[in-house]
Amino acid sequence: MITIKKQEIVKLEDVLHLYQAVGWTNYTNQPQMLERALSHSLAIYLALDGDTVVGLIRLVGDGFSSVLVQDLIVLPIYQRQGIGSALMKEALEDYKDAYQVQLVTEQTEKTLVFYRSMGFEILSTYNCIGMTWMNREK
């Protein structure tokens, strides 16, 4: 049975395998950055199968005006079982009073269908566009 738990402290060694399993090399090639990111997150929820971490959602932001879903990961063999939805629902419930919850994701049919099913809309719905700046030296 899968349980969802909000964690105050998340250790790198407990979740690095998730990032490796989905090929997020920006994190796996820079584990020190991920470790710092984990410790500075607004909230992290883990999906557990017994004692095994099989998924997580990581939020950043102030928790009131803006919350950003930075990471939502479920191990591939656990996907399509409602775990990602359960993680998202838990996070959205805890931050239901926030002005806005945002995320950036790959532009695929799979991700669009999933996030729309969770109530998210693309920014153009609000006559907005998203932008990002990345430090290309790192």
Model segments located where?
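A short helix-loop-beta-strand connector motif used in the catalytic cores of GNAT acetyltransferases and
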Residues: 35-46, 99-100
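Conserved acetyl-CoA-binding loop-helix of GNAT-fold acetyltransferases
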Residues: 74, 80-93
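Short glycine/proline-centered loop/turn elements that form peptide/ligand docking sites
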Residues: 88, 109-111, 130-134
